[in-house]
Regions:
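Short acidic/polar inter-strand loop motif in beta-rich domains
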Residues: 33-42
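Exposed beta-strand and adjacent loop surfaces of beta-rich binding modules
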Residues: 27, 70-72, 82, 156-158, ...
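A eukaryote-biased signal for long
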Residues: 110-199
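Solvent-exposed loop and beta-edge segments used for protein-protein assembly and interaction
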Residues: 20-24, 37, 67-69, 151-157
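Short acidic, gly/pro-rich beta-turn/loop elements at beta-sheet edges
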Residues: 40, 53-55, 85, 169-171
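Compositionally biased low-complexity segments at domain edges in trafficked proteins
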Residues: 54-151
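Short beta-strand edge segments in extracellular beta-sheet folds
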Residues: 45-52
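Tryptophan-paired
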Residues: 2-34, 173-199
Length: 199
């Protein structure tokens, strides 16, 4: 069990056991507590093998001209039983897949074996530790589930940077996308001016 952070797409809780390099996972099984809903969800699914293999076979050059590859996975858990999985590497975070699972009953004693407070108290105290989130939920409630799906919609982007400062030698640009993806684009690659589908 682990408490995870609240930055979409950014891994904040790390679990590594055994050998340094491992085969790509075939499936995921996870139970989590959605604090904003005070509900447990469960996902048990096969992962898209070809997509994972394709991503982990991808090689790119970083700003120091060193070959890079994806070297990890990040799992994000959202309300309404949604999880999103990203492949991560130096300067890149790319969506692998999005999965959904049902609400499930979980006893607090199973979730936090030494808990001395109820699930409701635990959820309330955890959310109150994030004042901006807490106030926003009180004021606006939880967004519709379509919001999370809409964040994943891809559009054909064509990035054309305009630099106002003179004598600036840019080597890269960092782009954060709504679906949690992230890309550090080398200036040479950006000058190719290719269109790409991004969320």
């Amino acid at each position: 069990s682990s408490f995870v952070g609240n930055v979409w797409g950014v891994g904040q809780s790390l679990h590594v056991v055994g050998e340094e390099y491992k085969p790509l996972p075939e499936a995921i099984e996870i139970v989590w507590l959605s604090f904003t809903e005070n509900k447990f969800y469960f996902v048990s699914e096969w992962l898209p093998k070809n997509r994972l293999q394709s991503l982990f076979d991808t090689v790119w050059m970083n700003v120091r001209k060193i070959e890079q590859r994806y070297n990890g996975l990040v799992v994000g858990m959202a309300p309404y039983g949604m999880i999103q999985i990203w492949a991560v590497g130096d300067g890149r975070r790319t969506e692998v897949c999005c999965l959904h699972g049902p609400e499930v009953p979980v006893k607090m004693s199973e979730f936090r074996p030494r808990a001395i407070i109820s699930q409701d108290e635990y959820v309330k105290s955890t959310i109150e530790d994030e004042p901006r989130v807490y106030e926003n939920l009180k004021k606006n409630g939880l967004p519709d589930s379509l919001l999370f799906e809409n964040y994943r919609k891809r559009f054909n982007y064509h990035i054309v940077p305009e630099i106002e400062m003179e004598d600036v030698d840019l080597t890269q640009i960092a782009v954060h996308y709504f679906n949690g993806e992230y890309d550090v684009i080398l200036w040479e690659r950006l000058k190719e001016n290719l269109y790409s589908l991004q969320a």
